[in-house]
Each structure stands twice: as structure tokens, then as C-alpha cells.
Amino acid sequence: MAGPTREFWQQRFVANETPWDRGAASPQFATWLASGALAPCRILVPGCGGGHEVVALARAGFAVTALDYVPAAIALTRERLIEANTRATLVQADALEWQAAAPFDAIYEQTCLCALHPDHWRAYVDRLDAWLAPGGRLYALWMQVIRAGAAEGLVEGPPYHCDMNAMRALFPSSRWEWPPPPYTRVPHPRGWEELAVVLAHRSPAVAST
């Protein structure tokens, strides 16, 4: 399997070597919430990591399901939920294999896609397509981290650079409704940026027309 393994991520969380972790939910979460773009519903957080967004969503009244295949990440998210005196459904499973019992109204995608080697992006987007109900919203924060090796064709990460041309190919307009650019740039403490985009999931009938 290309890219980092479960053991790689487990060691990172156990050693607290998680430089991508802001220490809090992304400021974009508060922006979406305050504007009404994101409102309480059944929401999935794949690749939940340390669970900052999981806690923030649960506190805001969402019915949250948090998904991660790393035991230490699930344990940390559980600890933070207990500390915050709030609740969410925690699922330890591989995002490329897990099947939901019912579709979700929304998905909060921030740290899963950029943690996966690009070889697995298509399979992951297929899972997003299956998890999200028609008309549901994908709240995406796509990592922008162009590395020097890219000029020589190297694929470097994690986190992997989420090129917007690649995102348009992965999320075609036949299945996903895109808002017009420009998109909000969200600074990261590590000096990276994320692009905030909300996609609407088209119904099969609309997608086939």
C-alpha cells in the first residue's frame, strides 16, 4: 500500500509528534458555523485524528460520527470528548473500507484526503460519494503544501498537496456542485494554507442528466 501505514500514524500519535495539529478546531469551522453555512445535522468526520473538530461539532449540537483507523487517534478523541462533557459516535475503521449504515447529511473533510497517498484518492472519493446523502454538503479544507520535489515529479507527504486541478478531476461537476472561485485561504500555523470549499452532492438523477 502506497503512503504511510497505520503503524506510522499510531507511532506519531503515541509520541505526540503531530505537527499538523492546530491545537484547536480550524478557524474556518467557526466561520462556517457563524454564517449558517454549517448547521446541526448528522455529520461524519473521516480521519478525525485528535478530534478537535469532533468536539466542536458535538458542542454545537451536531450528531457526529468520527472515523479513524488509528487506535491512538480514537483514544485521544474519546478523551477530549469526555473532558468537554459531550458525545459523539467513534468508529475505528479504515476509511477506504468502512460502510455507513445510513448516509450522512454532511461530511467534514479536513485531514483525511491530505493524509492519504494520492494513489488512494479515487477510492476515498468513492467512499465520500457513498457516505453522503443526495443534497448533502462536503465541507472541505484542502491542504496547499507545494514541496520542492514536485518540480521533479516527486509525490511527497504527508500531508500531500491537494492541487485544485486534481480536486476538480476527483470531484467532477456531474456528481458535485462547485461554488465559483476564489476560495477562502485558511492559514496553517506550520506555514501551509488550506482552501475552504463547500461542495453539494448531486442526486443520481441530476448527475446523470
Residues of each region from the PLM?
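Class I (Rossmann-like) S-adenosyl-L-methionine-dependent methyltransferase catalytic domain
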Residues: 1-44, 49-102, 119-131, 136-209
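Conserved acidic residues
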Residues: 105
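A conserved beta-strand element that flanks and buttresses the S-adenosyl-L-methionine
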Residues: 108
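Short catalytic micro-motifs in class I SAM-dependent methyltransferases
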Residues: 111-115
